[in-house]
Design a protein with these regions (language model features):
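Bacterial N-terminal signal peptides that target proteins for export
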Residues: 1-11
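Extracytoplasmic/secreted envelope proteins and their assembly/folding machinery
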Residues: 40-48, 62-74, 81, 89, ...
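Metal-dependent DNA phosphodiester-chemistry modules and their immediately adjacent helices/loops
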Residues: 502-504, 545-562
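PDZ/PDZ-like domain segments forming the peptide/carboxylate-binding groove
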Residues: 75-76, 97, 111, 116, ...
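Extended, small/polar residue-biased N-terminal targeting/export presequences
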Residues: 61-67, 74-150, 233-288, 348-350, ...
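Cleft-lining beta-strand/loop regions that shape enzyme active-site pockets
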Residues: 27-31, 35-36, 49-62, 234-243, ...
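Conserved functional hotspot residues or short segments at active or partner-binding sites
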Residues: 182-196, 204-206, 218-227, 560-721, ...
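Bacterial N-terminal signal peptides
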Residues: 9-21
């Protein structure tokens, strides 16, 4: 069973701020309506039969599910409530509680009715917007704002109200592009002025005094936006019958929970590509999000991870091959976009990226990568021994960074090519024991999960026996135990580092070590909160596609689910992710937190009793740590950006805001530089990749571990009798 946090690359959610493309001429093109093929009704009936039977909720396809499906479909097309009119929704609402009955009867026409109406309204909106862009008449002195978060905004009641929204939207996008270019030039000038005179002379000498070649004329913001909206409408008005069916049946499936979905035959190919870790030549797992390719996971060892500038949660909106032109990939089918990103080993590709920290979409980075194979050794666990001084005492401490729960499922340990993260970690633990390491930091930050078997085996390195996790499906509750006679590989104190990106198998391990009193959890307030298992099931003939259904839930051995709640930190050391609007609880129709009876287990230690004292010592220490105070300022600044609901449309106010935001986003690209490097108790800088210059959270984790070792007085977990065979 695989518990990796995989996000199915399915849909293109409509109408994202600052992105798209259309021309006024295209708006006058003849409209084409789409209708279902004759056998699509049978697919709908099959889905209506499977969801109540196999989904963990065991909920019938009823009026409640119908209402959720209605909302899913309407908001899939009109994500920011800017295309449909209120009267359109009132007309569609007549069938809001009837979709369950229609699909059971083999009627899937509602999905096509919504799509065709959406296309008609979209043409009207973009025709207006592109005419406005062509006139290029803006008043950037007026005291206006643009609402950037519109998921809860009311739909416009009239066409005039809709056009007022689109006027502000175009003004916002033009202003954002204009000021972004202006700030780029100012930054370039500052850097040039700051260079030593010798460098400037050397550069001039290399130029040989020749006249610079004329630069290629850039598009104006208006020209750039017209091109984007042209592509937006082209893509959104070209879906075939199968794609529209996928959108509709997917909306019905996701009414049960966000990880349940319908996959057309073409979409199933994308899913298989993701599950087989087809990494697009740059080392990333991708999904569709508001029309862009969202970075779900940066794979260790890949070009993207080695470069370090692209983060999980960033969005790819453009691709350039070698020295060619940048091609917009917004709203394109995922398969087409991936084909552009992939390529021969050693070739160059430039990605245009929207940083995760900018909800306005105004900031774009162009990052060149060289395509390469993913090096398996770079995906593996890494470890080292750190010498940490605290209070005049220097200790040897072990550190293991585990990027994912990898493991070979179809080979024996003696077979060539066998891989196991638990086995790799055990080798590091043996090394730590041999050099006398007194404790361990297990770093699960950014670990999205993987093999459940490996999660159990990893826990077995620290705990002698008992259940690791409970699993509840539609029929039974069971648990996965550590095999009897298991020898503990590491018996000394452990702290586990987690963040909001730690999910699934990571949450199982962190929760188990916390529940058994074997480790103290540090990091973001809580982890991601994905506590469910999905199964992919065929629906009959290949042309019917497949469905991905949530069939079980995970529970900690204390009886609490990891769903939504995740694993809470014993000591809160926030990362920048802690300030962003991410996590299972942010997904529509997420299954709620629940609990069952605790498993039969005994604590292996009681490290939790030291949490209050450790937390007080850490707080006192960090209060006087200038580096950490700066880190917290950045976290709070990022939180303010992510919670922003509107932006000014006056030039001066917007420029001040964008300049301040830039300073914070630069700190999301690389960790903060040390501010008090003369502190002789601060652990040495330890880069986790080529670009990471500092990790204040990891530094404090080592200090907390050092305090914990002092408090336990050298105590270790007793070694059980017997051997794990």
């Amino acid at each position: 069973m695989n518990t990796g946090m995989k996000i199915l690359p399915l849909f293109v959610a409509a109408a994202v701020c600052a992105l798209g493309g259309f021309s006024s001429q295209a708006g006058q093109a003849a409209e084409r309506t789409v209708s279902p093929r004759t056998y699509y009704g049978k697919i709908g009936m099959r889905l209506a039969s499977m969801l109540p039977r196999f989904h963990v909720l065991q909920q019938g396809l009823d009026d409640t599910v119908s209402q959720r499906a209605w909302t899913n479909l309407v908001t899939f097309y009109d994500f920011d409530h800017s295309v449909f009119l209120k009267s359109d929704l009132e007309r569609l609402a007549a069938r809001e509680k009837k979709l369950d009955d229609e699909v059971k009867a083999g009627n899937v026409s509602f999905g096509y009715d919504v799509y065709n109406l959406y296309v008609a309204r979209l043409r009207e909106r973009i025709f207006f917007a592109t005419n406005l862009l062509a006139r290029a008449q803006w008043d950037f002195e007026a005291d206006e704002v643009y609402r950037i978060k519109r998921k809860d905004a009311p739909w416009p009641e009239t066409r005039a109200e809709a056009e007022e929204h689109w006027r502000r939207r175009m003004k916002n996008e033009v202003l954002a592009q204009m000021l972004s270019r202006e700030l780029d030039m100012e930054e370039k000038s500052r850097k040039a002025a700051a260079r030593p005179a010798s460098e400037k002379t050397e550069t001039a000498s290399e130029d040989g005094g020749a006249e610079p070649s004329p630069a290629k004329k850039s598009d104006t913001p208006e020209e750039s936006l017209i091109k984007k909206y042209r592509q937006y409408v082209t893509v959104m008005t070209e879906p075939d019958e199968e794609t529209v069916l996928q959108h509709y049946l997917g909306a019905i499936a996701r009414a049960y929970d966000p990880h349940t979905d319908y996959m057309s035959p073409a979409s199933k190919e994308d899913f298989d590509m993701e599950m087989n870790l087809t990494l697009c030549g740059v080392g990333a797992v991708l999904s569709m999000d508001d029309g862009a390719l969202k970075i779900v996971e940066v794979m260790p060892g890949g070009p993207m991870a080695v470069d370090g500038r692209i983060k999980k949660g960033d969005k790819i909106v453009g691709v350039r091959q070698g020295d060619g032109e940048m091609e917009d990939v917004m709203w394109q089918p995922m398969k087409k976009s991936i084909q552009k990103i992939r390529g021969r080993k050693g070739t160059r590709v430039t990605l245009e990226v929207l940083p995760r920290s900018d909800p306005t979409g105004a900031t774009r980075k162009q990052i060149e990568l060289v395509r390469d194979e993913i090096k398996l050794e770079d995906q593996a666990a890494t470890g080292r021994v750190e010498r940490v001084e605290l209070g005049g005492v220097t200790r040897k401490l072990g550190y293991v960074y585990l990027p994912g729960f990898y493991g070979t499922m179809d080979k024996k340990m003696s077979d060539p090519g066998f891989r196991s993260c638990a086995l790799d970690v055990s080798r590091y633990l043996a090394d730590f024991n041999s050099v006398g390491a007194e404790g361990l930091v297990l770093d699960l930050r950014g670990n999205g999960g993987g093999s459940l078997r490996e999660a159990v085996m990893l826990s077995a390195l620290f705990v002698a026996g008992g259940p690791v996790v409970q699993i509840r499906d539609v029929r039974t509750v069971g648990s996965l135990p550590i095999p009897p006679g298991n020898p503990i590989a590491f018996r000394k104190p452990v702290v586990v580092l987690t963040d909001r990106a730690s999910a699934s198998a990571s949450e199982i391990v962190a929760g188990h070590l916390q529940d058994t009193g074997r480790a103290i959890v540090l990091g973001d307030r809580r982890t991601h909160g994905k506590g469910t298992v999905q199964s992919v099931m065929g629906m009959g003939p290949d042309k019917y596609g497949s469905t991905k259904i949530t069939t079980a839930r995970f529970y900690r051995i204390n009886g609490r689910s990891t769903q939504v709640e995740g694993v809470g930190a014993d000591i809160h050391l926030p990362s920048l992710l802690d300030s962003l609007d991410i996590g299972e609880d942010k997904l529509p129709n997420a299954l709620p937190f629940s609990r069952i009876l605790p498993a039969d287990y005994s604590p292996s230690w009681n490290l939790g009793r030291y949490v209050d004292e450790l937390s007080a010592l850490s707080a006192a220490r960090l209060k006087d740590d200038a580096r950490y105070r700066k880190h917290i300022e950045n976290v709070e600044g990022m939180r303010a950006i992510s919670e922003r609901t509107d932006v000014p449309l006056s030039r001066e106010a917007r420029k001040r805001m964008m300049a301040a935001d830039r300073n914070l986003r630069e700190l999301d690209d690389i960790d903060e530089e040390g501010a008090d490097g003369d502190d002789d108790e601060a652990p040495a800088r330890r880069p986790r990749n080529r670009r990471a210059k500092d990790d204040v959270v990891l530094d404090e984790a080592f200090r907390i571990l050092s305090d914990l070792i002092r408090m336990t007085g050298g105590q270790e977990v007793p070694q059980p009798k017997g051997w794990w065979l």
